[in-house]
From Swiss-Prot:
It comes from the Eukaryota. This is Cecropin-2. Its main location: secreted. Transmembrane segments: none annotated. The gene is Cec2A. It comes from Drosophila virilis (Fruit fly). PANTHER family: CECROPIN-A1-RELATED. Belongs to the cecropin family.
Amino acid sequence: MNFYKVFIFVALILAISLGQSEAGWLKKIGKKIERVGQHTRDATIQGLGIAQQAANVAATARG
């Protein structure tokens, strides 16, 4: 029975220490995903601006 308690204690300590070290690479992945989202947002805004200008040119050309 003592072995079981020691095993659980060691497993908890190991899980806590690994959980804290895992946050580093998880945070990096999160930042990469966030950066991709920002680039997508910026490209969409720029694309909408170009489309609006093209629509204005087309409307002006029609008279």
